[in-house]
């Protein structure tokens, strides 16, 4: 997924498109996207200064339902979005909160609670007014039925704050754990809150047989969003909301059949945008739904990984050098891209996961036997090994890191490369090496850097500043001179005469 997204971005070609807007001084209506600049300009000229007719004014009462309670993945996503926490950091802090009896079991894939928990959840929701510093009691509705669904709770219910957390308070918690606990608490209040109600107005205008529209949105009841905004203001002060503005007001007084006299027409240029690089938030979402179209309708476990393993999968990719973090983004490394390039197609597809999840489900229902399942696994492994053996040598060489030659060996004349701890001769039979940490330099509080090594190999000496004299307890400058003894490096100091 990471490499596919990177390739889409790299190969993306920006394309221009155009829109024409009409205005009578109060109301502005806009056309659909127009691919051709010439067509857009013709429409602008055609409509500019002419009359336009209001053909429709549609007003609708709409609602947005409250969000669900958190399972592990949705909480990890929100913690990344609001606070920049990695999925692993969120899981680690949640585990600590769980062990401190401040939250319920974190490794859950359910966003609901069971019928027998209604009274407990009601008590927790009502207690949030005192527990969360940014809430008022009037913001708590306690519509518990919305979060109750026995059929959608398997082993563990949604993540909730505990009664013990409300009794202890958040005073002794670190900033990160406090943020998570407030996030979980406000989600409980949102999930049991009222709907967000708004009036949506759409005005359609016709000019020269072309349609132009404007949409407006006015909140009627903020509902659960009032809690969300209070949380943002208190906990995410320096972060702009990524939610669209609640209010987009259209001017009053426009009705069907009205004529707009002498409208002004303007053309605007827009550009298509490439897909965005994954953040931990969006990657977790993609992992959760990956390959869903390829899964059998009866398959219970879908996506890549489970709520408990997705964070670890991401961390392993980073630790293995196949992915890296840059700010909030997660990017594939060169090694990661090369690996995907040579990997067999079936290993890259979520359909492989789908196939084996279906096999496990069939075994659970007694439709296939364990031996049949294991034979399939062995067969798949043998197939993968055969494919890997068939990878051409030039493709395997993609993973060999190009080594930089920093100089020639003064003993045998072979190339010298940089290693983790030294600069070594490429001839394995030669003992020559310049060690980054050696007793001679360490006694003067210095180590061998690449610049020094290059000059020693080229000139036999390098000027070093800031050497330390223990005897005089002071620093001095000198030339480090390379000598050889039995094919090994030996060092001495020389003090060049100062120019008069």
Residue ranges and their predicted role:
Residues 1-96, 100-102:
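Conserved phosphate-chemistry cores used by DNA topoisomerases
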Residues 8-11, 17, 87-88, 92, ...:
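Basic, low-complexity terminal or inter-domain segments flanking catalytic cores
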Residues 103-109:
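Short amphipathic alpha-helical interface patches used for protein-protein assembly/oligomerization
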């Amino acid at each position: 997924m990471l490499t596919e997204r990177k390739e889409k971005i790299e190969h993306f070609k920006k394309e221009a498109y155009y829109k024409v807007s009409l205005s009578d001084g109060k109301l502005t209506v806009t056309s659909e996207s127009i691919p051709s600049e010439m067509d857009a300009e013709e429409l602008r000229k055609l409509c500019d200064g002419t009359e336009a007719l209001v053909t429709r004014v549609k007003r609708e009462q709409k609602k947005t339902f409250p969000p669900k309670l958190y399972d592990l993945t949705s909480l990890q996503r929100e913690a990344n979005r609001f606070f920049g926490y990695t999925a692993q950091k969120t899981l680690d802090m949640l585990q600590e909160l769980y062990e401190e009896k401040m939250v319920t079991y974190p490794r859950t894939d359910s966003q609901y609670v069971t019928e027998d928990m209604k009274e407990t959840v009601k008590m927790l929701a009502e207690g949030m007014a005192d527990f969360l510093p940014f809430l008022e009691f009037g913001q708590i509705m306690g519509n518990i039925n919305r979060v109750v669904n026995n059929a959608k709770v398997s082993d563990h219910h949604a993540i909730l704050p505990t009664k013990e957390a409300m009794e202890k308070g958040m005073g002794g918690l670190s900033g990160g754990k406090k943020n998570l606990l407030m996030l979980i608490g406000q989600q409980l209040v949102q999930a049991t809150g009222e709907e967000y109600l708004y009036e949506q107005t759409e005005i359609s205008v016709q000019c020269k047989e072309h349609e132009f529209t404007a949409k407006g949105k006015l909140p009627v009841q903020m509902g659960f969003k009032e809690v969300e905004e209070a949380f943002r203001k208190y906990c995410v002060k320096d972060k702009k909301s990524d939610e669209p503005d609640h209010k987009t007001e259209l001017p009053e007084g426009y009705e069907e059949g009205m004529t707009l006299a002498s409208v002004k027409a303007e053309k605007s240029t827009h550009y298509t945008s490439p897909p965005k690089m994954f953040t931990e938030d969006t990657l977790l979402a993609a992992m959760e739904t990956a390959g869903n179209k390829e899964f059998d309708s009866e398959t219970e476990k879908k996506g890549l990984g489970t709520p408990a393993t997705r964070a670890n999968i991401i961390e392993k990719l980073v630790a293995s050098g196949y992915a890296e973090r840059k700010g909030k983004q997660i990017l594939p490394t060169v090694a990661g891209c090369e690996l995907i390039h040579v990997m067999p197609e079936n290993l890259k597809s979520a359909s492989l996961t789908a196939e084996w999840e279906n096999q496990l489900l069939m075994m659970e229902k007694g439709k296939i036997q364990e031996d049949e399942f294991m034979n399939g696994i062995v067969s798949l492994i043998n197939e993968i090994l055969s494919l890997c053996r068939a990878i051409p040598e030039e493709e395997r060489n993609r993973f060999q890191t190009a080594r930089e030659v920093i100089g020639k060996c003064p003993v045998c004349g072979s190339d010298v490369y940089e290693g983790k701890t030294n600069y070594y001769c490429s001839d394995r039979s030669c003992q020559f090496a310049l060690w980054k940490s050696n007793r001679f330099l360490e006694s003067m509080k210095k180590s061998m850097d690449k610049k020094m090594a290059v000059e020693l190999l080229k000139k036999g000496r390098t000027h070093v500043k800031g050497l330390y004299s223990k005897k005089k307890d002071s620093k001095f400058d000198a030339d480090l001179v390379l000598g050889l003894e039995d094919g090994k490096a030996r060092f001495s100091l020389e003090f060049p005469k100062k120019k008069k």
